[in-house]
């Protein structure tokens, strides 16, 4: 009986904590142009959207990592995908056309290593990885 109560309370707390992940992307009523992330229930992953700067809802994260931490299971190295070398590893990194400042990783063909660069939040190319580990898995091994 104690186990049942514990599981019921744990389940309720988890559902309440992550209930906002089921909300739709809500840009709000203001007119700013702020790249943000929300969890898309239908796709089962975090997606970028443009936030207006006010109102909205709790399914609104400044970084992709914050969204994933709140709404998805932790990634394992096996979740990473190999990249097409010509499009995902060979091009020089592109910061994109937005003005955010996200640390990302790209594969440098000259050094044969994954290196950090600053990503603006939208646009760019496929040589753009969220972690050094993901970049290395995609391009080095």
UniProtKB/Swiss-Prot annotation:
Give the GO molecular function terms. serine-type endopeptidase inhibitor activity; toxin activity
SUPFAM superfamilies assigned: BPTI-like
* Record Pfam families: Kunitz_BPTI
Q: Which residues form the BPTI/Kunitz inhibitor domain?
A: 21-71, 89-139
What tissue specificity is annotated for this entry? Highly expressed in midgut. Expressed in salivary gland, hemolymph and ovary.
What keywords tag this UniProt record? Blood coagulation cascade inhibiting toxin, Disulfide bond, Hemostasis impairing toxin, Protease inhibitor, Repeat, Secreted, Serine protease inhibitor, Signal, Toxin
Record's GO cellular component, any one?
Answer: extracellular space
Gene3D superfamilies recorded:
Pancreatic trypsin inhibitor Kunitz domain
Q: Where is the signal peptide?
A: 1-15
Note, other? Has no significant hemolytic activity.
Which protein is depicted?
A: Doenitin-1
The organism's lineage is:
Eukaryota, Metazoa, Ecdysozoa, Arthropoda, Chelicerata
